[in-house]
Amino acid sequence: MRKSRKSTGRWLNEGDAVIIFRNTGQVINHARILDRKFRIETPDLGTIAVDTDSIMSIVFKNLPTYPTDVLRTLGGTELNGTILNDLIRVKAQDLGGTVEIRKAKIISIIW
C-alpha cells in the first residue's frame, strides 16, 4: 500500500536547503541552515523575525532583477527589504561540517 504524503511547500525534504553562491554560481546541496530565524527589515512593517522552518526561499539583493532582499514563506507571503543576518551558519557534509557564510557571498537559499 502506498503512503500518502502531505506537501510541505518546500522543494527539498528533511529541512535540507540548496545554497547558490553569488559570484561563482557554485551550488551546495543538502545543506542544513542552522540559524533558527531570519530577520528582515521592511519599509512597511519594520523588522520581522521569521522562523527558518517557515521559509521557502530567500533571494538576496541582485540588481537589476532584485533591488532588495526577498524572503518567501511557506504561507505565500513575500517580504521585501534587508535581511539582517549577515553571517549564516550552515552545516553540510560537502563543506566539511559547520561553517559561517556571509550573506554577501550568497545569491539564494532554497528549501
Where are these regions (language model features)?
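Compositionally biased alpha-helical segments
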Residues: 1-111
